[in-house]
């Protein structure tokens, strides 16, 4: 071992000690999580919830677009129909042990029924407890879009009623009558 190698080795040791010493008095970036609350950013994609429309009914119309858009296939549902012709999910299941929280289901939903909340604390001891059913996902409020009601906006026909006869729906305009 030469004198040059000793000086270089000693210099690197001194540089490392100085670096550790300079960082010892800086502000810590690590948060002590359970004691200090963590505030996620405003557009954080966390747990999935199902919302209700302003009338208190389920917004989900079981169109199955969310399940098709999901890249990992963690959403499953079965469509059923009420007496007045409206669709609803007979069951709606999300497997959070597979979910990657990408938000594709929220983007695909035409009724804004699926919304992602900033809730991220979903630790469980058994994987089966991470499979949420419709009752676990439904919240009492309308979520991010309080005034939106899919059936009023879409103008979908309801059993026994023609277009324009449903609640809060105008008669269709005869386009041919507008021609000169």
From Swiss-Prot:
EC annotation from Swiss-Prot or TrEMBL: 7.1.1.-
Membrane topology: Peripheral membrane protein
GO biological process: aerobic respiration
Subcellular location: Cell inner membrane
Binding site for [4Fe-4S] cluster 2: 70, 99, 102, 105
Superkingdom of origin: Bacteria
Keywords: 4Fe-4S, Cell inner membrane, Cell membrane, Iron, Iron-sulfur, Membrane, Metal-binding, NAD, Quinone, Repeat, Translocase, Ubiquinone
PROSITE patterns per record: 4FE4S_FER_1 (PS00198), 4FE4S_FER_2 (PS51379)
Cofactor comment: Binds 2 [4Fe-4S] clusters per subunit.
Cofactors required: [4Fe-4S] cluster
Binding-site residues, [4Fe-4S] cluster 1: 60, 63, 66, 109
Molecular function GO labels: 4 iron, 4 sulfur cluster binding; iron ion binding; NADH:ubiquinone reductase (non-electrogenic) activity; quinone binding
Subunit structure: NDH-1 is composed of 13 different subunits. Subunits NuoA, H, J, K, L, M, N constitute the membrane sector of the complex.
HAMAP family per UniProt: NDH1_NuoI
Function field: NDH-1 shuttles electrons from NADH, via FMN and iron-sulfur (Fe-S) centers, to quinones in the respiratory chain. The immediate electron acceptor for the enzyme in this species is believed to be ubiquinone. Couples the redox reaction to proton translocation (for every two electrons transferred, four hydrogen ions are translocated across the cytoplasmic membrane), and thus conserves the redox energy in a proton gradient.
Family recorded in the similarity comment: Belongs to the complex I 23 kDa subunit family.
Protein name in the entry: NADH-quinone oxidoreductase subunit I
Organism from which the protein derives: Pectobacterium atrosepticum (strain SCRI 1043 / ATCC BAA-672) (Erwinia carotovora subsp. atroseptica)
Lineage: Bacteria, Pseudomonadati, Pseudomonadota, Gammaproteobacteria, Enterobacterales
